[in-house]
């Protein structure tokens, strides 16, 4: 058999396809991160994590690679610049980052700084996001788009921000909202910069397709759009409308759905121009997807188009329709948040242990002393001894039937616990023996295709699924998961990944594999005293802000890293994860009050001589230490 290589590992984890040339495996068998596609520079993730642990930064650790963030902004801007040139498009392109995708200050701040040379803007959908965007725009002069529902206070804030020099466009989502805007504008004497969101009949595809179509939550129907134009005319505010916006969903997997939306949206733009609305911008919303599984398909965790194809189709379709309608081409805006930030962050954590059975030495006597066994276990031993490739299916089915029979006999009191343990042990031996034969069969019979799942072990990892990758639990989103080390060795254990929450939903059983979605993740047998790390990739979009505090596991440690040619990497920022007291404070517990209550109770017990002073003092020290410690597991 040929020696396992890093190329074999790259294939089974499909790294070359989902990695966007930002992730690879080096000669040591460790995962590497690159600042940009095809860059000769890289950071060894295993070395980086070891260095962070030496700095007392414990896993789980969220690694944010700021160069990747800058590179994604540059890539999106570049492909649109090329598409504009190739199609002789007479207007400009501008990207806006929807901060709902990842509102962390350091992330938005980095995007604001990186985006200056690309004229990037910020999109917001709430009052807190508006305030955050205004703070980031201060000194940077970033344009801001306001989507979502708005009350009078929101509208007043936008209008006065406009008065004092901020470039803010307020997008009308509903007719009643426009009425409020008109009222506030007249009352304050401030003319707003307006956009209108239209509700397309065209829909996206996948889990977010309901963002488009006739039943979409946001936007004006065509009849309402005409009514809005009439209202603006009556109030001498039609010239305030500079932007038309539509959005048909996030993570659009098929390019034809994007084309359909572009055609319908641009036709509406053209008709509005003919009605005398001097629109300057066409905001095509989000939808630019990420190929999470590397299949380049229309599956919901992938996309069947490239970044270049997306940009070319946007520019071509808009220009073609505008030329046909005889109207000026608009400046184009997109809100591609997911595609901007998904790749830049990686969660790395340690595997704690697995659920492999510990085999006691005396179990081996089952095979040599069958006369002492119950009839059910004796039948299982006979199956084990007689298995061959000609009887695999029958032996497998008989084994399952007999193990179920052993449970029934145990429940009825005819089988004791030791005999049931014997049945479980010999069953596991049979399954492994069958698997050793199945692995050598080509092709594998249909009935045995999923057989290996019965061998899947659960590896317990030091993280909270609900905190760090909630979409995996909530909507069955696929994220690439790869061991960051030993990739020059064959991973010979099929696994599922369980977190450390007390919830059976905290387990991942669908993974990115060589041929798309797979039900088991190949990992290595963990060596004695080995720190074995796995990485969760492409988690930069939505996961941090959607994460919740199930079991009060809080934010993880986060580290901002940039590439450095001299020292390989530079740590820019370390953000400590939540301590126990911080998680408790989130649910209204005060750490000092906790200590006070416990201390008072202990003093009573000391006075009654139930505990000693030393025991009381030691427990208080432990409790205080726990309050100050990381919510995740240590040694």
UniProtKB/Swiss-Prot annotation:
UniProt keyword list: Decarboxylase, Lyase, Magnesium, Metal-binding, Polyamine biosynthesis, Pyridoxal phosphate, Spermidine biosynthesis
EC number: 4.1.1.19
Positions annotated to bind substrate: 282-292
Pathway participation: Amine and polyamine biosynthesis; agmatine biosynthesis; agmatine from L-arginine: step 1/1
Chain positions found as N6-(pyridoxal phosphate)lysine: 100
A biological process term (GO) from this entry: spermidine biosynthetic process
Cofactor(s) annotated in UniProt: Mg(2+); pyridoxal 5'-phosphate
Short name of any one Pfam family annotated for the protein: Arg_decarb_HB
Annotated coiled-coil segments of the chain: none
Catalytic activity: L-arginine + H(+) = agmatine + CO2
Xref: InterPro entries: Ala_racemase/Decarboxylase_C, Arg_decarb_HB, Arg_decarbox_C, Arg_decrbxlase, De-COase2_CS, De-COase2_N, De-COase2_pyr-phos_BS, Orn/DAP/Arg_de-COase
GO molecular function: arginine decarboxylase activity; metal ion binding
Cited function: Catalyzes the biosynthesis of agmatine from arginine.
Protein family (similarity comment): Belongs to the Orn/Lys/Arg decarboxylase class-II family. SpeA subfamily.
Protein name from the UniProt record: Biosynthetic arginine decarboxylase
Origin species: Citrifermentans bemidjiense (strain ATCC BAA-1014 / DSM 16622 / JCM 12645 / Bem)
């Amino acid at each position: 058999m040929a020696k396992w290589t890093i190329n074999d590992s790259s294939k089974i984890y499909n790294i070359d396809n989902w990695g966007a040339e930002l992730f690879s495996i080096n000669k040591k068998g460790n995962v590497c991160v690159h600042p940009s596609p095809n860059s000769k520079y890289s950071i060894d993730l295993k070395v980086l994590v070891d260095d962070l642990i030496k700095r007392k930064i414990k896993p789980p650790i969220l690694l944010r690679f700021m160069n990747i963030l800058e590179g994604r902004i540059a890539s999106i801007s570049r492909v649109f610049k090329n598409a504009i040139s190739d199609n002789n498009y007479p207007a400009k392109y501008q990207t806006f980052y929807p901060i709902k995708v990842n509102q962390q200050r350091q992330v938005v701040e980095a995007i604001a700084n990186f985006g200056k040379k690309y004229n990037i803007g910020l999109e917001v959908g709430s009052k807190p996001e508006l305030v955050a965007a205004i703070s980031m725009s201060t000194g940077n002069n970033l344009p801001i788009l306001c989507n979502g529902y708005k009350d009078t206070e929101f509208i007043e804030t936008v209008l006065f921000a406009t008065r004092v020099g901020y470039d803010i466009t307020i997008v009308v989502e509903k007719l009643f909202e426009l009425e409020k805007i008109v009222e506030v504008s007249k009352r304050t004497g401030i003319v707003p910069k307006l956009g209108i969101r239209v509700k397309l009949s065209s829909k996206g595809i996948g889990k977010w397709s309901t963002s488009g179509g006739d039943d979409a939550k946001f936007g004006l129907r065509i009849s309402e759009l005409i009514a809005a134009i009439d209202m603006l005319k009556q109030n001498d505010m039609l010239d305030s409308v500079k932007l038309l916006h539509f959005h048909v969903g996030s993570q659009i997997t098929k390019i034809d759905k994007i084309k359909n939306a572009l055609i319908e949206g641009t036709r509406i733009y053209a008709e509005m121009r003919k009605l005398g609305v001097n629109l300057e911008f066409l905001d095509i919303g989000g939808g630019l997807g990420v190929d999470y599984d590397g299949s380049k398909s229309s599956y919901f965790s992938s996309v069947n188009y490239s970044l270049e194809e997306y940009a070319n189709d946007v520019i071509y379709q808009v220009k073609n329709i505008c030329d046909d309608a005889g109207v000026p081409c608009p400046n184009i805006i997109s809100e591609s948040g997911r595609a901007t930030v998904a790749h830049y962050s990686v969660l790395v954590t340690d595997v704690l242990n697995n659920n492999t059975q510990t085999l006691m030495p005396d179990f081996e006597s089952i095979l040599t002393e069958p006369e002492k066994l119950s009839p059910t276990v004796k039948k299982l031993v006979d199956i084990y001894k007689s298995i061959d490739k000609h009887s695999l299916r029958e032996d497998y089915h008989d084994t399952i039937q007999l193990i179920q029979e052993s449970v029934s006999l145990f429940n009825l009191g005819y089988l004791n616990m030791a005999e049931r343990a014997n049945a479980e042990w010999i069953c596991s031996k049979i399954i492994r023996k069958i698997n050793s034969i199945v692995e050598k069969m080509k092709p594998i019979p249909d009935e045995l295709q999923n057989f290996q799942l019965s061998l899947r072990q659960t590896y317990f990892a030091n993280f909270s699924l609900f905190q760090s990758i909630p979409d995996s639990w909530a909507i069955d989103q696929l994220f690439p998961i790869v061991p960051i080390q030993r990739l020059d060795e064959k991973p010979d254990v099929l696994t599922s990944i369980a977190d450390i929450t007390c919830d059976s939903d905290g387990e991942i059983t669908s993974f990115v594999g060589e041929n798309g979605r797979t039900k088991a993740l190949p990992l290595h047998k963990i060596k004695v005293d080995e720190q074995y790390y796995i990485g969760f990739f492409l988690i930069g979009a939505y996961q941090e802000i959607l994460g919740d505090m199930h079991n009060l596991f809080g934010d993880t440690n986060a580290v901002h890293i940039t590439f450095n040619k001299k020292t390989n990497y530079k740590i820019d920022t370390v953000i400590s994860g939540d301590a126990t007291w911080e998680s408790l404070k989130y649910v209204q517990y005060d750490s000092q009050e906790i200590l006070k209550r416990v201390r008072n109770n202990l003093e009573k017990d000391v006075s009654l001589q139930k505990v000693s002073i030393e025991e009381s003092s030691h427990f208080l020290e432990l409790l205080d230490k726990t309050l100050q410690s990381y919510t995740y597991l240590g040694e």
